[in-house]
């Protein structure tokens, strides 16, 4: 009985905070010839309650392939494309990515999810339970 209590408590620690906390996303806009929002990023901030379902990263490239605009923000809906599309008239392309874990719209986009923590934690839990 005690082992199941420990197991349920650990699961709650892993999953409960994500449902209580607001999603934290990098929120910034690039300016021409400036580094902010490209590689120098602000801290991830709580998304407003009305748009706290997904983090977005939107990149716009000109016809020469140079990055002309970059936005990182919160949104209520996931991206319908999650990739790049050509802009009309051969003016360049627009790339859109959405994700739903804290800070996932950062430069690398490599942020461990709660599932990754759980996969790491489960063998430890089962080992501890089997030793009792």
From Swiss-Prot:
Its main location: secreted. Contains 5 disulfide bonds. It comes from the Eukaryota. The keyword Kinase does not apply. Expressed by the venom gland. Keywords: Disulfide bond, Secreted, Signal, Toxin. The scoloptoxin-05 family has remarkable similarities with the three-finger toxin family commonly found in snakes. This is U-scoloptoxin(05)-Er3a.
